[in-house]
């Protein structure tokens, strides 16, 4: 992918992730763009990988769909072979390896969060294959606005309700300033009981 096309592709979206004591919250806007064209106003940018892992997606839609499908298949295969759910870190590492192997062809950035036997965790995986563990972070063109709020208001002892409210607030701040983000906020909460998604 040319640098010019990649620059246009990566100019939309705001996704947010944060970790609590026993949960992970993911949030994303709903606007899908192609350059400055609004291609869709009701896009789900949060996807379920397994019963205890979800991810946000940013970048080229087709690339993201292929990567998500691969991660789902690998998670199911792991569970079939071992009888256990794939650890969150393993899913993030696999995504990183795939993106590294196919760079610069695949243009995807993900936040991968979940709860497993090690507790809650959140990983950021970029299109170069870089993977980092985070307490809170954001991706996309609206991320500078979202991160500036998270820097000031995130606490490790947030309740689930407080964390959801903070994630929504962070995305909404980006919606107010970033033309590549818009149309409302979707939320996923991940606990040991599973994943709950809703539109707010």
Swiss-Prot record:
Keyword set includes Hydrolase: yes
One GO-annotated biological process of the protein: proteasomal protein catabolic process
Positions annotated as active site in the UniProt record: 13 (nucleophile)
Enzyme Commission code(s) on record: 3.4.25.1
Highest taxon of source: Archaea
Bilayer-crossing regions: none
Enzyme class: hydrolase
Reaction equation(s) it catalyzes: Cleavage of peptide bonds with very broad specificity
Matches recorded under PROSITE patterns: PROTEASOME_BETA_1, PROTEASOME_BETA_2
UniProt keyword annotations, A-Z: Autocatalytic cleavage, Cytoplasm, Hydrolase, Protease, Proteasome, Threonine protease, Zymogen
Residues that make up the propeptide removed upon maturation: 1-12
Entry-linked Pfam families: Proteasome
Major subcellular location class: cytoplasm
GO molecular function: threonine-type endopeptidase activity
Keyword Hydrolase applies: yes
Entries under SUPFAM superfamilies matching the protein: N-terminal nucleophile aminohydrolases (Ntn hydrolases) (SSF56235)
Subcellular compartments: Cytoplasm
Gene Ontology cellular component list: cytoplasm; proteasome core complex, beta-subunit complex
Record text on activity regulation: The formation of the proteasomal ATPase PAN-20S proteasome complex, via the docking of the C-termini of PAN into the intersubunit pockets in the alpha-rings, triggers opening of the gate for substrate entry. Interconversion between the open-gate and close-gate conformations leads to a dynamic regulation of the 20S proteasome proteolysis activity.
Cleaved signal peptide residues: none
Similarity annotation: Belongs to the peptidase T1B family.
Subunit relationships: The 20S proteasome core is composed of 14 alpha and 14 beta subunits that assemble into four stacked heptameric rings, resulting in a barrel-shaped structure. The two inner rings, each composed of seven catalytic beta subunits, are sandwiched by two outer rings, each composed of seven alpha subunits. The catalytic chamber with the active sites is on the inside of the barrel. Has a gated structure, the ends of the cylinder being occluded by the N-termini of the alpha-subunits. Is capped at one or both ends by the proteasome regulatory ATPase, PAN.
HAMAP family for the chain: Proteasome_B_A
Function of the protein: Component of the proteasome core, a large protease complex with broad specificity involved in protein degradation.
Name used for this protein in its record: Proteasome subunit beta 1
Organism whose genome encodes this protein: Thermofilum pendens (strain DSM 2475 / Hrk 5)
């Amino acid at each position: 992918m040319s640098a010019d096309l990649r620059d246009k592709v990566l100019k939309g979206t705001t996704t947010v992730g944060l970790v609590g004591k026993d949960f992970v919250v993911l949030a994303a806007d709903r606007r899908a763009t192609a350059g400055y064209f609004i291609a869709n106003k009701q896009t789900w940018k949060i996807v379920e990988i397994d019963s205890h892992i979800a991810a946000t997606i940013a970048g080229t839609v087709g690339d993201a769909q292929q990567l998500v499908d691969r991660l789902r298949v690998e998670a199911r295969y792991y569970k079939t072979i071992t009888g256990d759910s794939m650890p969150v870190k393993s899913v993030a590492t696999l995504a990183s390896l795939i993106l590294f192997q196919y760079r610069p062809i695949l243009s995807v950035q993900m936040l991968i969060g979940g709860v497993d036997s090690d507790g809650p965790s959140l990983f950021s995986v970029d299109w170069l294959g870089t993977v980092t563990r985070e307490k809170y972070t954001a991706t996309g063109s609206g991320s500078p606005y979202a991160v500036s709020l998270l820097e000031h208001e995130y606490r490790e002892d947030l309740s689930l309700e407080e964390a959801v409210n903070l994630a929504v607030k962070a995305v909404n701040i980006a919606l107010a300033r970033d033309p590549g983000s818009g149309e409302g906020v979707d939320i996923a909460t991940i606990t040991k009981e599973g994943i709950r998604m809703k539109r707010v």
